[in-house]
Amino acid sequence: PSADGRLSLEQIKECYFNHWNDHSHEHTVQPGMVYLSCPAENGLIYSKAELTGISEFCHQHGLYLFVDGARLGYGLQSDGCDFTIADLARLCDAFYIGGTKVGALFGEAVVFKGEEMHRSFRYAIKQHGGMLAKGRLLGIQFEQLMKGGEDCLYFKLARHANSLAARIRTAFEKKGIRMWIPSQTNMQFPILTKEQQEILGKKYVPELWGRYDNGRDVVRFCTSWATTQQSMDTLCSLLKEYK
């Protein structure tokens, strides 16, 4: 398991070489692909240098590199991101652009670097019951979401969510409440007492992320393309009740 929700190059190397240095390696699954989530489940993103290092190791050792981009828009538009979608296309063998979490009605757009995987993918879709009769509707959504380059609707919606998440972080920090992790995306993780959670429960349903210490929990807040300034105002007014 990782220390901060992200896989490190050293962890990947350790797993890979432990397998091949084992004289009975044929009795375990052969390493074939590295799977990264970006952003990770806790809102953290990889740096361009980290992705480059992982990509180079993968391609030197015959491993595919796949990036789960369910929240990719929020990662690419965060203040801490130093790579572009073009960098992902260069460094990865495959990744997907998440639509469902960034305003699309349904669906994700899978991007392949090589012709070999692209040619076989439609067979996999069909064999696993994922081929839609009206699949073109997926494409129409992404055509509209991605139109306009850096000023496209996809990135605008992501920036909107990130800005409101930053407002959540600022509001909690002004009340002296610590954040569990320095997320710069649309997810924030304040550390709250039971009493503080009950106050929020008047208007919201806080998601319990995990126990922090005696009497305090890590709670996750997610903003999205649909979050409104009015919702933020309501949250900030509830925080005024915190002692």
Residues covered by each model-derived region:
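Active-site-proximal loop/turn and secondary-structure-junction residues that shape catalytic pockets
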Residues: 40, 71-73, 101, 225-227
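PLP-dependent aminotransferase-class I/II
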Residues: 1-41, 46-53
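Structural preference for beta-strand elements that scaffold enzyme active sites
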Residues: 33, 64-66, 94, 218-220
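Conserved C-terminal alpha-helix-loop-beta "cap" of PLP-dependent enzymes
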Residues: 166-167, 171-241
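Active-site C-terminal subdomain of aminotransferase-like
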Residues: 25-26, 30-40, 45, 82-184
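Catalytic PLP-binding core of fold-type I/II PLP enzymes
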Residues: 46-78
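Distinct, well-ordered alpha-helical segments
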Residues: 76-85, 198
